[in-house]
Amino acid sequence: MRGSFTYRNAIFILLLGVFTYFYGLDSRFAPKNGDEYPYMHIVRMTADAGAWLPLQSEMDGIKNTKPPLVFWEGIVSTGWGSDWTLFALRWPSVLYTFLTAFFLFLAVARYSGKKQTGLLAALVWLSFFATYRYGRPFLTDPPEVFWLSLPFFALLYWGRAAFESKLLFPLLAGLCFGMALLSKSFAYIVPATFALGLFYWHWREWSIPKVLLQDLYKVILIAVLALGVFALWFVLDPFPEAVWKEFVLGENAGKFEARSSNYFLDLVRGGDSIWMLALTTLANAGLFTFVLISTLIQAWRERRFLSLEEILLLLLVCAFFIVFSLPSQRSGRYLLPVMPALAALIAMYWDRLPWWGFRIALLLQLVVLAALAWVGGNLQLSNFLGQPGIWNYSFLHWGFMTFSFALVLLGIFSRERCKAIALAGCFLCYCALTSSLSPLEGS
């Protein structure tokens, strides 16, 4: 056993993780994506108009940049704009993220037979920087990841009952995928149904006749139902032609156009190459990137002895990677829905993973904490913007930074505590970042 994960570790890191996701949730400088600002603008304008549809915007070309579900959620959470705060806009995103973590916990705990493993999977996923960056702000990613993941969690949780279900599971999966499409894009039905097809095919022991006769209609039913839910946007919007032009043609079809001179050259070189897609997908793990790499290496070494669940998780990752390597715009953000699967793999291999991935994570955390402390200390001692005392930290901030630094150092030199501290260190770094940026809030 290499650094087993105890309930004491789990409870401490769980409390730390919950605190981390709510700490600074209303900050203007929280890690996020630039899409949040136009999304907030659409919510405000639509709420002021007093109607759910059409979506409103004063910015050219972004009125129908995304389906309406996330904007409707923003309208509800802010009380039609009456409670216009970042916290009111963002807390539904955190709720979606925590629900995804909860159902990931249930699925992994069920098929592994260990609640510690399930809890570890949820905590690892929450520790990924991409989860923290995209799972807190007012963005489309939290509901998209939740609704896309739910059917796959159900297959892992119920196993045979879900795979053999002739109608109930396909109907529920279709509704879940439909909600995901209504949150992000109809394009996600392609990787989702491709992954489901691979799941069914493997369940039938790679027999093409069996999967065609027993499961093909299920995948078709799921796809049709999901697209039907998405099509409600066209039915309810008084200007469906604008939705078609701005969203279907502008936002989605344009992603297949070559970014430079040649689609196939873009595929193998440059910033939108398939290699960059692989790299940015790994980088979604943030400080745990090398832990993820060591997990994939371990899975390759044990490829002849993989369990059913491990194979299904890898098939899910491969399906999304293959599909999203086809558009000319390739980004690891498109593969956020498979990060829970990769977190589950890390949790399942946790006790067998080598130390080097965790030690690199701890060294990266040490660098982050040292950089934040150095920059913050210099700003506090300097006359920021020509006025002394503007950039000030409390003793609590420096006490927290000292504690975090000491804990990470302990993890580097203690083999027994290395893995658990590396996981906790991710959340400590996020808290340190938020605390270090607090003077920008004017407090």
Predicted region positions:
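Transmembrane-lumen/periplasm boundary regions of multi-pass, lipid-linked membrane glycan transferases
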Residues: 39-45, 179, 183, 188-306, ...
